[in-house]
Structures are given as structure tokens and as C-alpha cells.
Swiss-Prot record:
Changing R31C: In HH12; uncertain significance; the patient also carries mutations in PROKR2 and FGFR1. This is Progonadoliberin-1. One of its GO terms (molecular function) is hormone activity. Residues 1-23 form the signal peptide. One of its GO terms (cellular component) is axon terminus. It comes from Homo sapiens (Human).
Length: 92
């Protein structure tokens, strides 16, 4: 390699290392910045548990569309009633 190419490669590598070392690191609380001590760590975990609990709560939505009764369902009910009348037994 020519000395200019080696110098350029070294400069690019140095720039890449400096950029990587000086970049923002994430704290244990999954939020940027802040100190990493044990007290904040416990608070962060408790905060995460609260957030997950809020996400886990389900919301109930009612169906707004009208679903007509199926004719087959009505026919099945009529046949069951007819069979019960003929046999004299009641469905359990």
C-alpha cells in the first residue's frame, strides 16, 4: 500500500473509533443519558413493569354491525323442537 492510502485508512479508522466511543450510550432504564447506579436501576425496572401492565390491559370494544340470524340456525332449532315433541324428551 502506498503511504497516502495507509494514512487515509488510518485516519478513517481513527475517526470511526472516536465516533463510536463518544456516542450516546443507553442507560439501564432504556432511556438515553443518566447515571447507572443501583437505585435508579430498581426504579427503572419498576417503571418498566408499570408500563407493561398498562399495555397489557385490554380494552373491550362492542361490535357495531348487526349480524342477522342465520336461517340454518333457525332451522336447526325448529328441528330440535320437533324431535323433542315427537319423542317426548327434553334436551338436557
Amino acid at each position: 500500500m502506498k503511504p497516502i492510502q495507509k494514512l487515509l485508512a488510518g485516519l478513517i479508522l481513527l475517526t470511526w473509533c472516536v465516533e463510536g466511543c463518544s456516542s450516546q450510550h443507553w442507560s439501564y432504564g432504556l432511556r438515553p443519558g443518566g447515571k447507572r447506579d443501583a437505585e435508579n436501576l430498581i426504579d427503572s425496572f419498576q417503571e418498566i413493569v408499570k408500563e407493561v401492565g398498562q399495555l397489557a390491559e385490554t380494552q373491550r370494544f362492542e361490535c357495531t354491525t348487526h349480524q342477522p340470524r342465520s336461517p340454518l340456525r333457525d332451522l336447526k332449532g325448529a328441528l330440535e323442537s320437533l324431535i323433542e315433541e315427537e319423542t317426548g324428551q327434553k334436551k338436557i
